[in-house]
């Protein structure tokens, strides 16, 4: 696939600066429950979003792996999934330029139904491109809205492909045509284009997770720890810029998350949505910052709504549905901010797969597997609590309790 033009000197510098701290996967044995996993996350370590009964996979440096050995864990290095990223055999994946072209071509083919917008620009100046699917020529804030976003984390390229596929299916499937006439459907395939492009620089994988915004000479903030709700509260992120879960020097310090925040604040009609990640095969609902099922900042009705949403999405996708903190504690993430700060009904979907870099043959099946859940979230966008037989009245979803 084409990579675009890269300045050779910049490429050499970028690769040389990262050589001493190469990120690679390591299997860590002796991690058997959410408390063990949270202990690792509290150290600023990146253990991905997938857990096995007796181990996790650390994505980190050799020094980080050795530090766990000192703590008594058994650590085994893994071989990289592939020596090349997006090889010719995997041309189904889109780099940034190809993603933008796909969106533009889609809009050109359906000019009355597909409307391109931008959240803003990334740290390196890339457009955070999105589409609005609707028969309304201009944004209609009186219609219920639903929001889909991919790639908070750079190496999770599969999320871009699934979101693009869902975008296409909304117009290809005649049975959902009514949603185009009764909803405002907002889709952003990639929230982290800078990190995504860096992850494939030089034609090989780098297991890069964060964005590319420097702080104290260190590159990258974890965009899914940079939201303001319970930011940095609960050992669910790191204050060290060297760590993979670095939350940034302040909430919304990343231009990408700030752009998403401003868009959400300007769109009170958006009542629910999905953020796509990989590769744990999970459906996660709030909260991530606490193990409590129903903390003081959540109503019983809302908890029941999330459980019901998870159950329906499990029925169609087959993924395990659970509270986010059952995996491990997180703070400052998208789910918690969407519900805790804005009282919307977010779901994080962890796509399946055996690695962050599955072959492109995996894309179509995973997209179709997730299509019914995407439709379901759009169908209930007018009043998510209706699935537990609680009406919203004329003003949309009910307000959350005071925080």
Outline where the language-model segments fall.
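M14 metallocarboxypeptidase catalytic domain recognition
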Residues: 19-403
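Bacterial N-terminal signal peptides
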Residues: 6-14
């Amino acid at each position: 696939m084409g990579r675009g033009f890269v300045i050779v000197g910049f490429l050499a510098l970028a690769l040389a600066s990262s050589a001493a701290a190469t990120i690679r996967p390591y299997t860590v044995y002796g991690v058997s429950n959410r408390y063990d996993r949270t202990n690792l996350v509290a150290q600023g370590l990146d253990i991905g979003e997938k857990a096995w009964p007796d181990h996790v996979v650390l994505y980190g440096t050799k020094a980080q792996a050795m530090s766990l050995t000192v703590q008594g864990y058994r650590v085994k290095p893994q071989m990289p999934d592939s020596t090349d990223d997006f090889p010719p055999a995997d041309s189904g994946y889109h780099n940034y330029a190809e993603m933008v072209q796909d969106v533009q071509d889609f809009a050109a083919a359906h000019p009355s139904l597909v409307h391109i917008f931008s959240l803003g620009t990334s740290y390196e100046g890339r457009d955070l491109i999105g589409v609005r699917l609707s028969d309304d020529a201009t944004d209609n804030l009186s219609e219920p809205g639903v929001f889909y976003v991919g790639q908070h984390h750079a190496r999770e390229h599969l999320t871009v492909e699934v979101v693009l596929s869902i975008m296409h299916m909304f117009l290809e499937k005649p049975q959902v045509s009514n949603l185009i006439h009764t909803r405002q459907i907002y889709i952003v395939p990639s929230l982290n284009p800078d990190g995504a492009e860096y992850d494939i620089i030089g034609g090989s994988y780098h297991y890069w997770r964060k964005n590319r915004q420097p702080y104290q000479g260190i590159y990258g903030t974890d965009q899914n720890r940079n939201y303001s709700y319970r930011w940095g509260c609960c050992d669910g992120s790191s204050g060290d810029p060297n760590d993979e879960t670095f939350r940034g020097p302040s909430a919304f310090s990343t231009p990408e998350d700030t752009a998403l925040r401003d868009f959400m604040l300007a769109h009170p009609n958006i009542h629910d949505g999905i953020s796509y990640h990989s590769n744990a095969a999970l459906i996660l609902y709030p909260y991530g910052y606490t193990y409590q099922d129903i903390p003081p900042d959540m109503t019983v009705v809302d908890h029941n709504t999330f459980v019901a949403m998870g159950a329906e999405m499990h029925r169609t996708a087959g993924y395990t549905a659970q509270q986010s903190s059952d995996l491990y504690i997180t703070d400052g993430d998208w789910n918690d901010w969407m519900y805790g700060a804005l009282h919307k009904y977010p779901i994080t979907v962890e796509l399946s797969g055996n690695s962050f870099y599955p072959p492109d043959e995996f894309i179509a099946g995973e997209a179709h597997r997730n299509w019914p859940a995407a439709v379901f979230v759009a169908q209930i966008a007018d009043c998510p609590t209706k699935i537990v037989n609680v009406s919203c009245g004329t003003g949309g979803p009910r307000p959350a309790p005071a925080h």
